[in-house]
Curated annotation (Swiss-Prot):
Its cofactor is [4Fe-4S] cluster. It catalyses: reduced [plastocyanin] + hnu + oxidized [2Fe-2S]-[ferredoxin] = oxidized [plastocyanin] + reduced [2Fe-2S]-[ferredoxin]. It is found in: Plastid, Chloroplast thylakoid membrane. Its EC number is 1.97.1.12. Keywords: 4Fe-4S, Chloroplast, Electron transport, Iron, Iron-sulfur, Membrane, Metal-binding, Oxidoreductase, Photosynthesis, Photosystem I, Plastid, Repeat, Thylakoid, Transport. Binds 2 [4Fe-4S] clusters. Cluster 2 is most probably the spectroscopically characterized electron acceptor FA and cluster 1 is most probably FB. The gene is psaC. Residues 2-31, 39-68 form the 4Fe-4S ferredoxin-type domain. [4Fe-4S] cluster 2 binds at C21, C48, C51, C54. The lineage of its organism: Eukaryota, Viridiplantae, Streptophyta, Embryophyta, Tracheophyta. The eukaryotic PSI reaction center is composed of at least 11 subunits. This is Photosystem I iron-sulfur center. One of its GO terms (cellular component) is chloroplast thylakoid membrane.
């Protein structure tokens, strides 16, 4: 089952989540909205193992990157699983 990876605008562009991901789901892309001029992106969510290492690596108090496991996603959408 696929997991969902959400990057929030509290991302500070530090690259910690990208480096922590064992399956290379995340990458940095240019973004003018933060001091680092880059933000995390999740173009390969189909490869997400659901380990949440990216969440653990995030230094912000707001968890700028969140992994929603497949059962959390279907439950929040009101879908059967």
């Amino acid at each position: 089952m696929a997991h969902s990876v959400k990057i929030y605008d509290t991302c500070i562009g530090c690259t910690q989540c990208v480096r922590a991901c064992p399956t290379d789901v995340l990458e940095m892309i240019p973004w003018e909205g933060c001091k680092a001029k880059q933000i995390a992106s999740a173009p390969r969510t189909e490869d997400c193992a659901g380990c949440k290492r990216c969440e653990s690596a995030c230094p912000t108090d707001f968890l700028s990157v969140r992994v929603y496991l497949w059962h959390e996603t279907t439950r929040s959408m009101g879908l059967a699983y």
